[in-house]
């Protein structure tokens, strides 16, 4: 599986992970937590409530929120504020995966982020090293910003 995009099944698993009390709802605090982990949390809880219009989301609303807020109608990635400069949005996404801030994404960092996002089993099963190698055009064993940007823009 390629980590260059989040599928609907991935979102369903995220929802299930976020829904700690298994009531079928994700609260705004839980939504802010995942947005923060993805590097897209730029709103206060009150601002997010104004955007969402309620205190919690069911699965369908969660999926709709993701697709409306994170993806445009053509499916291209954008951040919550729909910044005009794609590099800024891509840099924020890159920084989610560049855990140690050295400017490179390693297989270990990819695995760590997947686990933080609730994909513990998948992180163990997926070959994160292979995923890095697929996008590592300069063959240094890491994905740098330009390689990440190229991956994002050509998904």
From Swiss-Prot:
Keyword Metal-binding listed: yes
Keywords tagged on the record: Calcium, Metal-binding, Repeat
A single GO molecular function term of this UniProt record: calcium ion binding
Entries under InterPro entries matching the protein: EF-hand-dom_pair (IPR011992), EF_Hand_1_Ca_BS (IPR018247), EF_hand_dom (IPR002048), EF_hand_pair_protein_CML-like (IPR039647)
PROSITE patterns assigned to the protein according to its UniProt record, in alphabetical order: EF_HAND_1 (PS00018), EF_HAND_2 (PS50222)
Residues the entry annotates as binding Ca(2+) 2: 98, 100, 102, 104, 109
SMART domains referenced in this protein's UniProt entry, alphabetically: EFh (SM00054)
A Pfam family recorded for this sequence: EF-hand_1
GO biological process entries: cellular response to hypoxia
Record-linked PANTHER family: EF-HAND CALCIUM-BINDING DOMAIN CONTAINING PROTEIN
Role noted for this protein: Potential calcium sensor.
UniProt protein name: Probable calcium-binding protein CML44
